[in-house]
Amino acid sequence: MVSSSLTKLVFFGCLLLLTFTDNLVAGKSGKVKLNLYYESLCPGCQEFIVDDLGKIFDYDLYTITDLKLFPFGNAELSDNLTVTCQHGEEECKLNALEACALRTWPDQKSQYSFIRCVESDTKGWESCVKNSGREKAINDCYNGDLSRKLILGYATKTKNLKPPHEYVPWVTLNGKPLDDSVQSTDDLVAQICNAYKGKTTLPKVCNSSASMSKSPERKWKLQVSYANKATNY
């Protein structure tokens, strides 16, 4: 028998389809679907967002990439749809705040700029809101019912991952999780360049992959947060 929690989750997922319309695989534009499933207080997520994800914009890869962020991570959902976050209540609040920000801006550059601001200093998130130019819209969403609906939508997306995520940050390219060969930002850049099938001219960085591989690179040593594991705060 399907649990009441799952039934309710499916209902909310259907209810929010218009809000979260997004194909996991490459669309007609040929853009690479880059999805990041994360939680706001996961150390590895913070490092990846601040230090690595920015290269998508530094290298103009956003022109061939459809970047989507899903701030739910390893949170748990009870039968009455209560959300319990891995790193405590503060993480739930920041996840909801970031969900509202993602809703507020239509373009991925503005979305990333705000998320990066928060993840760079999670205790100073209020200044990110005040300096965003969208303070009222974000606060109205965060303080109203919409933030909860958005989080439930992200819960649906995260829980329906196939294969299921094992930890966060969890990154997928065109619906498939990164394999073990991707161990640095350069590796991720190369994967994006190779996955692009559209007609837009490739960013210069895609034509310099050979020289990139010869230069020293920072191997990822991310402090990931595993699913179904308790975290001591």
From Swiss-Prot:
Q: Which InterPro entries match?
A: Interferon-induced_GILT
Q: Which residues form the propeptide?
A: 200-233
Give the tissue specificity: Expressed in the outer integument of seed coat.
Which residues does UniProt assign to the signal peptide?
Answer: 1-26
Q: Which GO terms describe its cellular component?
A: extracellular region; lysosome
Q: How does it assemble?
A: Dimer; disulfide-linked.
- The molecule here is called Gamma-interferon-responsive lysosomal thiol protein
What are the top taxonomic ranks of the organism? Eukaryota, Viridiplantae, Streptophyta, Embryophyta, Tracheophyta
